[in-house]
Structure formats: structure tokens, C-alpha cells
């Protein structure tokens, strides 16, 4: 069961959850989330998900090395995104790194932070479709505990400024 949202109660402030992944359009989601935070007086929470496969015990040492490398990559990606958020609105975003199924990790992050008021994703504008995360989320979007905003991946900063 989802936690009661407290974003606008006294002593709380609304926060936007944005997913930082390896797609080319992640920057559009980060830009929109930053602009939203400026306008709403809220904050930005950046989530990076490391997708893990079932580990074969025989290869556990290799899996540990791969996990450590994935964590370093996740930190580097969040560093880039945090620089972008800070450059847009002088906001210091919260950072979360999780491992596992992306949809389950997003839902768990939302459940654990009652101040999260919005999930922002960006869609790939190309012919290959909106991207794997959006494809996964659309299957359960009707039961999401917070609103989901999908930003078109080909919107410019100026376009997003006008919309947010």
C-alpha cells in the first residue's frame, strides 16, 4: 500500500522524482524536473537503477566486480545529472541508487518518501519507440501513487521553459 502523500503539509515540501538512465533523452526529464522544482518551490530526487540479473554462485566474484563497476557508473551519471540540476536552478538534488527491477524500484522509492509528488520521464522521439522504461511503466501507470509526466525527448530548453 502506498504511503500517504505529505508533499504540501506543514514542514514538508514537494519533490519530483526523475530517473537518470543511459538513454539520450534523460536530460529532458532532468531539465523539466528542475524547472518544476523552481516553479513549485520543491526539490528534485534523482534515481539511478542498476538492473541486476540472477547471479550464478560460481560467478559470484565476477558479479561483485560487475556490481561495483555499475555502482561507479551510476555515481558518475548522477554527478552529471546533479551538475545539470544545479546549473539550471541552483538546486542540490537528492541522489538514490537502487538495484533490481526498474518499476519495482521506482514504486518502492515513491513509497518510502511521502514528499514525492511527481515522477518525470522523457520519451525517445525516434521511431524505435518511447524507451524501455516508459514501455514498462505504461503497463501499470493506472495504479501509480503519484502523477507521471512524460516529456517529449525533442523539446528544447526554451520549449520546456514555456511549459513548466
Feature names for model-found ranges:
Residues 37, 85-86, 140-141:
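A generic structural signal for well-ordered alpha-helical segments
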Residues 45-47, 94-98, 149-151:
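General small-molecule cofactor/ligand-binding pocket signal
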Residues 6, 48-76, 158-164:
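Acidic, proline/glycine-rich short linear motifs
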Residues 6-60, 143-146:
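Small/aliphatic-rich secondary-structure junction motif
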Residues 1-11, 86-119, 162-164:
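Structural beta-alpha unit
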Residues 118-143, 155-160:
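Glycine-rich, Arg-bearing micro-motifs that act as flexible, cationic patches
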Residues 29-32, 108-109, 136:
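A short acidic, amphipathic alpha-helical/loop segment
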Residues 32, 69-81, 105:
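Short, solvent-exposed amphipathic alpha-helices that sit
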